[in-house]
């Protein structure tokens, strides 16, 4: 076991990402990150006492190259004795039908497939190959989109059944590991373009910033991500205590006592509103959230549509969430 494999195993134990008897589904595209994920897991699976399987998505976006990726990953799994699952998607057609970007469509298709495999083949964890450079790029991408604290946190090491055990590793470390182990990988040349937003950030924006501020950008973005994560955990704890201390803030019942809400800071009000909306299955933008928060300073009877047939209305001293029967999206 070399130093990279030891670091990987130590991180798995420290973060408690896998338990004895877990079945881990590895998302493997054939690129360097996912091939490192595959070989690192294969090297420590016996120590972790976990079963491995691989899921490969053929998005049929690159013609013969997509099929070659599929064959490559299939052969790698056969060589390692790991179960291989593949699904082909007509991503371009689905993207058009869903009226979503290719990136978003591929993401949704990918995770639907992973969830289906977990149910059918009893996988308990899904591991992806995101690393620290991906996290830094995500923070920058979210910053450009005007994200709040949650967005600046970047990629979480764990989200439900999904784990990202390569987050402590840089892209450079991953490539060095593959070269040391003489593991080959597939290059997706579409990653070198700038058509997609993330590629534009990776290939144009970051190099320009690093040229001016050498070796400072990635560590700085990583620190921002860590600080945002710590702050988000503090906020979650603080809001949970607020809700426990004030029975009038009944998120589950869909009503919030106006008098109590008015005693809170605007930040606290919005955090509570976001949690109440989440329980309604809603995630609204900042404009709608500001309008809902503004109800606290209005007369009774005023309302704000929150989307998906839900409106927030000021009535009898409470903010109430009620169904309108109109599912139109006002977000």
UniProtKB/Swiss-Prot annotation:
The similarity annotation says: Belongs to the tRNA(Ile)-lysidine synthase family.
Q: What is the lineage of its organism?
A: Bacteria, Pseudomonadati, Chlorobiota, Chlorobiia, Chlorobiales
Keyword tRNA processing included in the entry's annotation: yes
Q: Which molecular function term from Gene Ontology is one that the record holds?
A: tRNA(Ile)-lysidine synthase activity
Do the record's keywords include Nucleotide-binding? yes
Please state the gene responsible for encoding this protein: tilS
Report the catalytic activity. cytidine(34) in tRNA(Ile2) + L-lysine + ATP = lysidine(34) in tRNA(Ile2) + AMP + diphosphate + H(+)
Q: Where in the cell is it found?
A: Cytoplasm
**What are the BP-aspect GO terms?**
tRNA modification
Name the Gene3D superfamilies on file: HUPs
Protein's recorded name: tRNA(Ile)-lysidine synthase
